[in-house]
Amino acid sequence: MNNRLEETPQIDNTDIILEVHKISKRFGGIKALNNIDFSVRRGEVHALVGENGAGKSTFIKILTGAHAPSEGKIMFDGKEYSGLTPALALDAGITAIYQEFNLIPFLSVSENIYFGRELMKQGFLDYEQMNENTKKMFKEIGMAINPKIRVQRLGIAQQQLVEIVKAISKNAKLIIMDEPSAPLTEQETETLHTIVRQLKGKGITIIYISHRMEEIFEI
């Protein structure tokens, strides 16, 4: 697995939010990851570049708790983990946006963002507040999507924005983006990169996974 670090001079080098020490992962006799050391600072965009089969997906799944490492440890935001569960990762502030979005097509944008964490008022779902909060979160990244529209009516780029806002709503400290530009047009990719820079400005750490070297230098 190869990686490239984008330097962020205004952030103290000692402000490391994620450290991975000697992480290995075996599947039977196959070693998918071998003694990986990796660190990233708070509010930094860190690109991981590698071809298919390089271990990028396995690495994501370890960070998000879908796989337990065979060896090694993870330090995140000052806490040490020998392995993460999905619930622990989410509580810690780690979230991932995969190429296949985790959205429910027949629900609205705001319902997807608050799914499983719905706001209540006097025993009923508080749609008004969820819609208002959703509008504000989109505005924070310079975008506008009707929070009442069903996700199935949105294009791929808009669905990706819903995933990003969903991560923001969960107070994500680290967002892992897996080949986020793969389904996008050139203009949509430029918009995505602008949003990534905005998230960085808010102190959110981004791990940006891609196999396109030319794209990495644009972020």
Q: Where in this protein do the model-derived segments appear?
A:
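Glycine-rich phosphate-binding loops of nucleotide-dependent enzymes
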Residues: 2-219
